[in-house]
UniProtKB/Swiss-Prot annotation:
Catalytic activity: dTTP + H2O = dTMP + diphosphate + H(+); UTP + H2O = UMP + diphosphate + H(+)
Species this protein is from: Methanococcoides burtonii (strain DSM 6242 / NBRC 107633 / OCM 468 / ACE-M)
Protein name according to UniProt: dTTP/UTP pyrophosphatase
Cofactor dependency: a divalent metal cation
Keyword match Phosphoprotein: no
Amino acid sequence: MRKVVLASASPRRKELLSKLIGNNFEVCVSSYEETPLQEMNVEELVVFHSLEKAKDVALRFDSGIIISADTVVFCDGAILGKPHTLNNAKEMLENISGKSVLAITGMTILDMDSGKCVSEYVSTDVNMKQMSSDEIASYVNSGEPLDKAGAFAIQGKGAVLVESINGDFFNVVGLPLFRLGTILEEMGISIFDDC
């Protein structure tokens, strides 16, 4: 199998990629610093960030496939990344309570051997339940929201805050597996070889 490198420190992305290709990859965290760029819309921004992460990590390798991603939640015209404090998480949850939000992941797959690069985004509609102040406080105090875009983990306790989704569930977690699997197959990484 060809070398695959995940350009992410996210334990969730690592777990998701292992669902597709087992543990046949290495992790190399990008040193690229994400900054908001006013001239870009949210979709362009997450794609740009994922591309810059992939390019940064590619400098450390001679061959292989680099996978990078950037996920945000978009609500009422605002980009919600990861909350930095408990109060910030509380404010985000109050903002998205009872609303439909978008989980948007920019993803780059860079084949260093062929030079092929796919950079695109995947969106998933997420309908949040109307949350009480007590629910928000309890969830925030659990600590789970702190390293999650939009301050909720659909794959954890935050699942009870989500009424429904339309789109790729794994995209909300941080890596759109359907689209990623398709691209990897196109690049010669067989998902079903070991089945």
